[in-house]
């Protein structure tokens, strides 16, 4: 079955183990990491674990190949995971994501924006869809964001004391204002 492959670490200190197995482990010792992948999918018996220093740590994962991401297995992290794939992202009915925060986007994000905590996403003008038919479970106070040209959420999203954002457009900013509220701004010309 499909598992993430072709990792290229762009930023941060990361070791990846479990290649060619059903259980991929990504150990991150820096607060942030950026990883470009040739492909990033998880088959229904597969599991990917991101281990980070804390729940405030984050990893930007960008697919540079031509295949969509299908999450049919388990994606776990004690920290925040951002998955960007312009070819599309789908969490199937068997897929389970458990993280402190999770963002799936078909819009792109610049490395420098991520490293400076700017959650700015820009599409290519015809961004593909993000679909959730599975379960996204966010730890207390975190956020789940699905961002794409089209969003379909027929699955389950739990973010106790946290925020859920569904954004459809070609330019989206996630804004965490002082009280922890999440605002999704889509420029008016996109509406």
Question: What residues fall within each predicted segment?
Answer:
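Extracellular and secretory-pathway beta-repeat/beta-biased strand scaffolds
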Residues: 1-191
């Amino acid at each position: 079955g499909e598992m993430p492959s072709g990792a290229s670490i762009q930023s941060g200190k990361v070791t990846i183990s479990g290649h060619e197995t059903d259980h991929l482990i990504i150990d991150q010792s820096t607060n942030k990491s950026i990883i470009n992948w040739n492909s990033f999918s998880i088959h229904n018996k597969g599991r990917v674990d991101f281990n980070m220093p804390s729940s405030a740590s984050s990893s930007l994962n960008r697919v540079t190949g031509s295949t969509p991401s299908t999450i049919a297995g388990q994606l776990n992290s004690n920290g925040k995971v951002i998955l960007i794939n312009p070819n599309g992202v789908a969490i199937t009915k068997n897929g389970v994501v458990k993280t402190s925060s999770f963002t799936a986007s078909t819009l792109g994000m610049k490395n420098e924006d991520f490293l400076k905590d700017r959650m700015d996403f820009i599409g290519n003008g015809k961004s593909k869809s993000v679909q959730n038919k599975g379960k996204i479970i966010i730890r207390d106070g975190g956020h789940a964001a699905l961002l794409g040209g089209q969003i379909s959420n027929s699955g389950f999203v739990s973010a106790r004391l946290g925020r859920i954002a569904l954004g459809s457009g070609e330019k989206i900013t996630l804004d965490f204002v002082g009280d922890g509220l999440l605002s999704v701004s889509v420029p008016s010309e996109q509406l």
